[in-house]
From Swiss-Prot:
This is Maturase K. It holds the Pfam family Intron_maturas2. Belongs to the intron maturase 2 family. MatK subfamily. It comes from the Eukaryota. The gene is matK. GO terms for biological process: mRNA processing; RNA splicing; tRNA processing. GO terms for molecular function: RNA binding. It comes from Typha angustifolia (Narrow leaf cattail). It is found in: Plastid, Chloroplast. HAMAP family: MatK. Signal peptide: none annotated. Usually encoded in the trnK tRNA gene intron. Probably assists in splicing its own and other chloroplast group II introns.
Amino acid sequence: MKQLHVQRYLEKVRSRKQHFLYPLLFKEYIYAFAHDYGLNGSIFYEPAEIIGNDNKSSSVLVKRLIIRMYQQNYLINSINHSNQNRFIGHNNYFYSHFFSLMISESFAVIMEIPFSLRLVSSPEEKEIPQFQNLRSIHSIFPFLEDKLSHLNYVSDILIPHPIHFEILVQILQCRIQDVPSLHLLRFFLHEYHNWNSLITSKKSIYVFSKENKRLFRLLYNFYVFECEFVFVFLRKQSSYLRLTSFGTFLERIHFYGKIEHLLVVYRNYFNKTLWFFTDPFMHYVRYQGKAILASKGTHLFMKKWKCYLVNFWQYYFHFWSQPHRIHINQLSNYSFHFLGYLSSVLRNLLVVRNQMLENSYLIDTVTKKFDTIVPVIPLIGSLSKAKFCTLLGHPISKPIWTDLSDCDIIDRFGRICRNLSHYYSGSSKKRSLYRIKYILRFSCARTLARKHKSTVRTFLQRLGSVLLEEFFTEEEQVLSLIFPKTTPFSLHGSHRERIWYLDIIRINDLVNH
């Protein structure tokens, strides 16, 4: 019923060829969507937990908050007279936090509506289910296996942050022409920055991203889209160049100005002539705030791309020059962290004897293979942060879980272990996972022993087989069927086959620490 209201309103807006999203802020059903899965049903979105379940979101409350936000010096007056204002309450930080969550979640919902409907109403709607497997994170690795083994250099790129809020609003303005909504967003972000500077000492955008996840993801995705749009434009321009007698491609690249909308490409940001060595074997992969640019070209070619990106960040997004965010390395001598894996290109030297009639000779052949392994030390650091072990990897108990039942404790530890094994099924060295499983298994035993005030040895003797079965993953069972001669216990050390799954759509929290 609620979704029907939204669709009717948007059909009316679409018939008038207008994009008025601001009135939706004052529709009661929007605030039900803002805190459940109602609108998009996406598993990527986790509903926000507003402080205090008794404080229900409503259009009346939001209207009051917006009016107060527009009042002059209301924040200073509210701090000085907080005891006299029942609406704000005794804790101004509670009020500001509650206000920011409510407004940001609702604002993000109405901003997502046009793009969600655009996707649903697209002519390719029937073809979308055929490509659901491409959503899997593991679908990236077969691509890297096929491409990186033929390339020479790789650039690790950290997308610049934090970005100024005003730049984010200007980027969003290219897609949404609703002036009142953008004005409210700009004012809200400005006031939120003032709250952080008055109430806390943290002024970074990191604070905003932690407390307003949905709105931050929306703004951040627009920002990344802007970066990649220009990057793709430059890549296409460099591929259209003509071949010279020296075997290089030279061309002047122009940046077009953003005049009317985002589809007009960029210009007038560089006054100098920019030179490119084109390379048909260039590949770009990004996840979250990190990207990889790999090429078969020379080191000079990669340095020119680095120069382009740094200048683009500086002139278009008004960043200070940040060349340290791009590191160029030779693939044959470098291992890079990406999506929780430690990846590299291995060189194997093969000697082949060739026999021709009475003569024989040896041929040295070099083969390259893309390799992925488990980064054990970072994972142990993540387990240490989560209080499963010490910094040295010694298992410790989890006191916060001692109030749970024995089955729940074993199930939680087993689920973490299975998720990690499932995600790292693409590792060529399964032995690295054995240490992680050892830590989780003994942490589980120590937690149970702490709960029952007993010793670890007692519980290992009593629940040894149960714990072993709980930490024995489905991947190992599948591999034992594929390789019947290999025992389950030797899979940790001897098996090197990699399995990529097409149902992994997010990184485990322990992987992403």
